[in-house]
Amino acid sequence: MSDDQHESIDGDETMEEDSMLAEGHEDGEEDVGEDEEEVETEESQGVPTTSEKKKPPPKKKKGGKKSSKKKNNCDYPDPYKSTSAEISAAIGLTDVDVDYEQEEFQSITNLKNFSSLVKPYILKVNPGTNVTKMYPLFQVKYKEFQDHMTAHGKSIQKQQRAKFVPVPVPVTPQEKIIPQKTRSSARRKRRDGSDGEGGGHDSDQEFEALIKQHEKQQDEAEKGKEEARINRAAAKVDKRKAALESARASKRARKEQGVVEENHQENCEVCNQDGELMLCDTCTRAYHVACIDENMEQPPEGDWSCPHCEEHGPDVLIVEEEPAKANMDYCRICKETSNILLCDTCPSSYHAYCIDPPLTEIPEGEWSCPRCIIPEPAQRIEKILSWRWKEISYPEPLECKEGEEASKDDVFLKPPRKMEPRREREFFVKWKYLAYWQCEWLSETLMDVYFTALVRMYWRKVDSENPPIFEESTLSRHHSDHDPYKLRERFYQYGVKPEWMQIHRIINHLSYAKSQQDYLVKWKELSYEHATWERDDTDIANYEDAIIKYWHHRERMLNDEVPRNVQKMIAKQREAKGLGPKEDEVTSRRKKREKIDILKKYEVQPDFISETGGNLHPYQLEGINWLRHCWSNGTDAILADEMGLGKTVQSLTFLYTLMKEGHTKGPFLIAAPLSTIINWEREAELWCPDFYVVTYVGDRESRMVIREHEFSFVDGAVRGGPKVSKIKTLENLKFHVLLTSYECINMDKAILSSIDWAALVVDEAHRLKNNQSTFFKNLREYNIQYRVLLTGTPLQNNLEELFHLLNFLAPDRFNQLESFTAEFSEISKEDQIEKLHNLLGPHMLRRLKADVLTGMPSKQELIVRVELSAMQKKYYKNILTRNFDALNVKNGGTQMSLINIIMELKKCCNHPYLFMKACLEAPKLKNGMYEGSALIKNAGKFVLLQKMLRKLKDGGHRVLIFSQMTMMLDILEDFCDVEGYKYERIDGSITGQQRQDAIDRYNAPGAKQFVFLLSTRAGGLGINLATADTVIIYDSDWNPHNDIQAFSRAHRLGQKHKVMIYRFVTKGSVEERITSVAKKKMLLTHLVVRAGLGAKDGKSMSKTELDDVLRWGTEELFKEEEAPVEGADGEGTSSKKPNEQEIVWDDAAVDFLLDRNKEEEGQDGEKKEHWTNEYLSSFKVATYNTKEADDADDDEDETEVIKEGTEEQDPNYWEKLLKHHYEQDQETELQKLGKGKRVRRQVNYASENMGQDWSAQNNQQQEEDDGSEYGSDNGELLQTDEDYEERRRRREERSEKLPPLLAKVNGQIEVLGFNPRQRKAFYNAVMRWGMPPQDLTQSSWQVRDLRNKSEKVFKAYSSLFMRHLCEPVVDNSDSFMDGVPREGLNRQAVLSRIGLMSILRKKVQEFEKFNGEWSMPETREKMLATAAQASVSNLPGMIKIKEEPIDIDETPMDVDQSNITKTEELASEVKVEEEPKAPRLPYKFNICDGGYTELHSLWINEEKVARNGKEYEIWHRRHDFWLLAAVAVYGYGRYQINFQDIMNDPKFSIVNEPFKQTGADPATNFADVKNKFLARRFKLLEQSLVIEEQLRRAAHINKQQSPDQVGQLAQHFSELEHTADAHVNIARESNNGNRNANAILHKCLAQLDDLLSDLKTDVARLPATISQVRPVTERLQMSERQILSRLVVAKDPDAAPSKPALPPSGPFITPLFNQNFTTIQPKFPSLFDCNLSPDDEPIDIEGSISAAVAEASRASSIAATKDEPMDTSDKDIPSTSAAAGSSYPRY
């Protein structure tokens, strides 16, 4: 080794020693004392001390150690020549033996690492030892460690002894240069004074002198280096400090200038956690206090820089100077190039005459364009209301006489030619936090500079070429005389509603001086969060009136002093009205204010009510007197007047009288439905002008403003912020009445329950009928002095609800529900009714409109009986026949099943299209809508409704149609579309503002809507439709009170015409029987107390009563079978014999029905028996014409009904009536399935809706019907007509104009003509079926809401929908790029569902040709054979049956209908014989999931069990195929798959087979077991299909897995397999009692467990490697929209429609060239060895470890070894593991 190398090693070791010394110095306090002694020694010897050198602490430690070594050098033996025992003895320590074979010593490469590792061993034996003294021992130990490792074959570079670097020393000629010696040897070598050679140059004295001289020179050199190093370090510190201070100063300056600084990071720089952080003032880093210094308790004050900035200085942002942009070569306005002015601050260029206004002189010096000098608005824009065009004229062109040259200024300032005025846009904007009065027009330039994003979003919603036109801009009724502010011209015609500019009230003020205030103004029809602050001198209409009203209220409530400027306003206003001074009015008012006795009855309405201009009806005044009487007695009240009698007005004026007469100051709480809040506000403003009413509704921000400004005059009485808390003080409350909704009662209970309420009014009090509701419980906890409940139906269902109302009113009196109901269990008795009235008398007041409104237009209710159509009769009889088992008394049908049958029959009475089968078979137009004539003729109610509505339309009447079925409303919409009527609709799904908008549109003057469709339940609450005078109850509700609520929407105060109510009842049906029962038994006992059919559980009517309802009219219905049955199109035959009793509604009968002038029977002399008989007394039967025109029909009907009630019912009635029909229908149904007697099809050749290929159908008909008279000539003629119709239809479709992309119709946004409901229906259909097919007319994909869309419009919307899915739009954006609203569309979820349904359908189609269309064809054949035998047994004259075998056709189910085996017509030729059990048909099905799921493991285990005739009873892959096929047919439901529909379909009956044994167990929840299993199984199949698709795509692009990704997995598997094979016999020996084998077995099992855990972890990471296939957009380097356009246009020959855009079906089914499937499968050694014989028995997995390993490997290899569909009928597949097999139950 050279000297240079020695020197390098010496230097490294010396630095290493220094670092060790520094480490040792920090470990103990004793070292500090030793360092001080060493410093004193150095000072005494003249060595520079640490303080003189100004060394940092590490250098101080180094110097101190050097002195210590020098001082103690004589005591230590040489560490390079001594052992560790000697060094330990010399130091005074106990030696430690260290095992160098430990794993932690194998990576040691230097002394420092070795010392840190050995130090704990030494300190453990020698506690408290100074670490500095251990260093020699470390050196010796390290030398021994190196020798030990070298002896064991591992070479470690040995530590070299340190050497000095020679320093040149000037010597005299006599002196001889001493050979170089190492410093350590020179220090440790002792001078021997007994050297015999004496003097000379080699003497010891001379050697010591040279050593001292050399050390002195070395110390001086080190001193110079140290000083230079200290100076450099100090300079760096000073530089960093200056940089930090400069950074702080710069930051403060930027902050003062308002420059937005970069935000600090949100997590700690050290621990990357959030919390309370210290922010650095010179960078963006943040730290926890504890992360900087664990001993720091408080953060430092003032400016603070983080450790990074202290060490490295502040971050310097290097800003690269961008090159100056060149100006445009053309004018930004006109795009011309000559004579342009260049902006000095931006790249824009302009002509001087293109600027608005034009320049008059050429600017000198630097010039900035209009875009640069336009000022930024001080406010933020809230929204853009409208825009308009603004014309800008150009200056006169430059004119030069001949021979004259234009000056340079003129050339620049004037255009060279005459230029037409140009147009620029102006935007009408609403400023945030400012009122609509401050809306302004802004130029397009300003908007483009400062609000680019807002403008861009605005253009997505409106047309950028045609300004929007609002309703107010087209009205001409406004005159400037009545509009001094020119509001219409300035605001209304540009989208501002007039109410938005009208002051509702002032809610607060701020005073700057005695006569200067700002007011917080709340605007009409805007929520409180839009309230704005306005100055008192702002010019706003009626602003002074609002200010005066505000101060009057404060004066009345607080006796607050009115400011002088407001007093001047008041005096000026009174002087203009001719009134005297205000003081005189106050004095007179005090004199008149006398407290009136509350027991005094009002004979006339009081003056303060008359001052409002309103007049109360006498009955309303009586109601107020009654409420005042109840108040005086402390009796809580129920005001139960019939709807429309003004309960709102009576309750408000009652509270108003209490306040005006001084009985109470309030406050009052009114809880009402949200839909009626607006009506309450209007009535309070009209009847109670001095009431300060606060409407406490809205979102969280609005309610926060209300609590802060409207609850109390005391500042801080309510804590600000969104969190609701109790009010701090109840003094000086600001309001008299708080009007709120049921929801706010629950949400803001904290503050509302903390107020002491003088009275409570609950509107629609039947919300309190359930004492378990949240509303009931919360409201009971309020502190309320008096309660008033308002309800139009106090007894809606039963006495329990009435008890809950009384319990809320008087909980101390009504607290035992059981005793109450028991006492009134027999309400039908007169004395009990009287007792109930006496009990309710003090609490309830109820008047009827018939009793009190003698001057109000009357209402007349008629029962209109209609006939069943032929199609309805067919379905009616079919429902009864199909439910024969439930109807037959012998079979014990339940009450619930009978109620379900009644519901089905009611649907049939409404319209047969409510049934799915009739809906699918109904004639439809090309666009999918129902054919109009068939729609009307197939329902008897529609036939009459058509005639009635046409005459009502001609007479100028308007109609409300009520139905309790929303599906019926859908069909009624189709009816209105067919008839061309405009309509509105309200059902349970339409709430809030949409409901109110529909009502306002219908009630608007001149509204074109003729019909209003309402659901009975949703249409009976908070709706005023007095503009309609005709009510049609299409189907009666179970609860008649709901019908009363419904038609009261029209018959109420405000109605000017007589109201006609027509109740449709189908003759001879359950509807008629139910109506007749209600007509005779409408006392409280039948439908109120006992709840009847209105009860939810349906148990209040006995089975006998239900059976009586079902029997009504059935006998007559089935007697009509001798007449020919009409077809589905509703057209009868000419040979039909008319029924003499059939009701015929001709024109004369309809005119008589609609006659409003005829006198109502019994109108004068009839006296109402009791208020509970309102429903009964309102029933009137309409007069209609019959064939016999018998006037005594009604009497006969009544007599018959009464007699029928006393007759004993025949227990065999249903069996006699239906058994024969039931058997016939069973036979007919089975024949239609494909076996039995051939059914000749009845073909109507005159129909225009025949098949597409007429000639083919004609040929088929000729084959079936011999001797047909229709020849080919007729076929050709019809073919020609068909071609003509087809060409005409195509011409119309081509000429059809698409609706606009976005349009607003009736307040709703339409997209390509699709309203919100239709868009929702399209989305739901996509989520259920995937994307629609190409042939829309033949598809069942379309839903009802989309049938009226043409094919062109439908495809256009489908294309738009897909284009939106392909847009890379942010999920939280409100609209797509074209402005279409997103409406919460989840792009990822929709695409996933479309892809999944596509994969699923493709998989089913792949194997459908092998497996057929029926899952269990043999079961179907058995059913056909049974039907054939039943048909033979019913033949007349049957004597004997030949017993001969029947040939069973075992061909697949896709055979032609003509090849099906036929049943002979004669009984003697019928063959019946017990056939042997047919073999189960083979099948094929496979999913190649690559072993990534447990699907194949389950299949192997299941198919071992599914043998020997158990192919249907054990679930396996056959069932999985049929489950997928069923999902492909039925699709997804709203949230999940509806497995009930699948299990009810006979085609998929195999799905039910595995559950039959479970269903027999009564302790098992049968439905729950099935649904859970099917959901779990389908989820597994879904995952497998997705993985197969990923594998297919990976193989299609030759994607291979990297060996590194599966290498670790293969290694772990090899170790697992090796361990298992090596210990195969251990388990057997352990069972024989070998203890050693038992210990080895436990150790082996533990090792296997670890290996399996690692293997599971590796397998879990494998599917992620498949997802690494690059997306299509990345592989094609195209955006999603470009790919979509390529697929649509198909200009590329490779992208032709005939070629699929995706890879082929599956790599394991149709292999492609150069495909390598093995590279995308897991490479396990056992993957390719899975062949077992068919006779192999299931392996006993618990008995052998190796068996488990082998089966686990085989389970993941099934899909990898097959390239074709798997035919499991020919061979068996090996079993899977026990774990996989036991994860599913074996059904």
Swiss-Prot record:
Residues 628-812 form the Helicase ATP-binding domain. Keywords: ATP-binding, Chromatin regulator, DNA-binding, Hydrolase, Metal-binding, Nucleotide-binding, Nucleus, Repeat, Zinc, Zinc-finger. GO terms for cellular component: chromatin; histone deacetylase complex; nucleus; NuRD complex. Residues 373-476, 501-583 form the Chromo domain. Its EC number is 3.6.4.-. It is found in: Nucleus. Residues 192-243, 1761-1773 have a biased composition (Basic and acidic residues). InterPro entries: CHD_C2 (IPR012957), CHD_II_SANT-like (IPR009462), CHD_N (IPR012958), Chromo-like_dom_sf (IPR016197), Chromo/chromo_shadow_dom (IPR000953), Chromo_domain (IPR023780), DNA/RNA_helicase_DEAH_CS (IPR002464), DUF1087 (IPR009463). It is an enzyme of class 3 (hydrolase). Residues 10-43, 1190-1199 have a biased composition (Acidic residues). GO terms for molecular function: ATP binding; ATP hydrolysis activity; ATP-dependent chromatin remodeler activity; chromatin binding; DNA binding; DNA helicase activity; histone binding; zinc ion binding. PROSITE patterns: CHROMO_2, DEAH_ATP_HELICASE, HELICASE_ATP_BIND_1, HELICASE_CTER, ZF_PHD_1, ZF_PHD_2. Its main location: nucleus. The keyword Manganese does not apply. It catalyses: ATP + H2O = ADP + phosphate + H(+). It holds the Pfam family CHDCT2. Belongs to the SNF2/RAD54 helicase family. This is Chromodomain-helicase-DNA-binding protein 3 homolog. It comes from Caenorhabditis elegans.
